[in-house]
Amino acid sequence: MRHPLRSLAAAGALAFGLAAAPALAGEQYVDETGYAVSGYDVVAYRGLDQAPVGAPQPRAVPGRAEFTTEWNGARWAFASAENLAAFEADPARYAPAYDGHCAYGVGKGGKVPGNPNLWRIVDGVLYLNINPAVVSFWEEDVAGWIESAEGEWP
């Protein structure tokens, strides 16, 4: 049996949570792998040939356990010692926007994980999204969604 008051309370809690989303920034998102960006090498994205909007991106490059560092409350993995050194020299340059959360989700006022294989670099910043359907929405107006996300993120 459905309970209208519970549904109303849940909707209110969701609305309150989305309204409070800007306060959600903090440490880097870490999933069940125990690594930021699911253990993929964030420096390696710069060496991949970025696909045009509407086309799938090349697969992210997995990091290796022997090339890791800690930053922003998370463990980061890299494919090589050179990429590890580049990250350690300037982690903010390579870390994904919104602590690794989905750029479209942040633009909508939420906070959901980003998928390392659904990426785009815009003006030198790495953005992740959660699933292919979201990527298609986000790519309809990349600049507009980035502007929305920046307004939601502290």
Regions inferred by a protein language model and the residue ranges of each:
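Bacterial N-terminal signal peptides that target proteins for export
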Residues: 1-10
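N-terminal leader/assembly segments
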Residues: 3, 20-25
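Bacterial N-terminal signal peptides
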Residues: 9-19
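Charged, low-complexity intrinsically disordered segments
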Residues: 23-154
